[in-house]
Amino acid sequence: MEPYLSNELFPPPTEAWLQTVSSDPEAQGWGAWGRTEKTSLVPRAGSRAGSDKEAEENEDASFLLSLLEPENLAKSPVFNQELEAIKLKLWAMEHAEAQPEPPCVQRKATEEERAEVRQLLSPETVDCFFSRTSKENVEADHRSVFVGNVDYGGSAAELEAYFSPCGEIHRVTILCDKFSGHPKGYAYIEFASHRSVKAAVGLDESTFRGRVIKVLPKRTNFPGISSTDRGGLRTHSGNRAAFLHGSLHRKARLRAHGRSRGHGGAPQWFSPY
């Protein structure tokens, strides 16, 4: 049985429909989706704008990547400016370390240092410092006593307990040899008041740890001034006297020998030295 074809049921395709089908793959059915898309003869405005944007983005990306290449980096003006700035900073730092300060700056610094030294070594500052120190030392010495013939095994705590009835004690000092560290056998006791010194002197010739101790008020030692007759003057005078004594005896020997030669006999007097 042959199929029955009727133009009324299936009219022939028109030219407009053919153009639409050829440009739109969806209108061709599902079989047309698997085939490669045919380019339209009439380009659309939207597709052209999209392709232009993609082209611009590709150009920008390729330009940025080209800037990162070493050859293009060396040719870049921004890179050259930054490199020159870094080189200039390094050069300035090296020259600042190697080159000395200008003479005016050095002269100003030396003048300031000299002014500070003059101020520190000025008589007013030195006198004020030494006067304050000497006054404090003199005041402490007036409140202290010297304790001699102290037993070597005695401690500062034992001395403090022994002299505590005399008054409040600020400090007990037992002098020791700086080389061996052994005590020298005497000590200094500093009291809080002058009255305690008088009471402590009353313990003179008393017995401490089986030994008779000597208690005296402490002397005040001034720098450069000796409180005894011993000193450089005595040594100088002694040397001078020895020199005079030796010169007199030398002259006496010369005279004795001269007379013996002149008279041809023994001298009238003899010096054994």
UniProtKB/Swiss-Prot annotation:
Q: Recorded GO terms, molecular function?
A: poly(A) binding; RNA binding
State a GO cellular component annotated for this protein.
Answer: cytosol
Q: Name one GO biological process term.
A: maternal-to-zygotic transition of gene expression
The record's section on SUPFAM superfamilies has: RNA-binding domain, RBD (SSF54928)
Entry-linked InterPro entries: Nucleotide-bd_a/b_plait_sf, RBD_domain_sf, RRM_dom
Annotated region (Disordered) at: 22-57
Location of the protein in the cell: Cytoplasm
Q: Which domain of life, per UniProt?
A: Eukaryota
The entry's keywords:
Cytoplasm, RNA-binding
Note whether RNA-binding occurs among the keywords.
yes
Q: Which PROSITE patterns match?
A: RRM (PS50102)
Name all RRM domain ranges.
143-220
Free-text function comment from the UniProt entry:
Binds the poly(A) tail of mRNA.
Spell out the protein name for this chain.
Embryonic polyadenylate-binding protein 2
Q: Name the encoding gene, please.
A: Pabpn1l
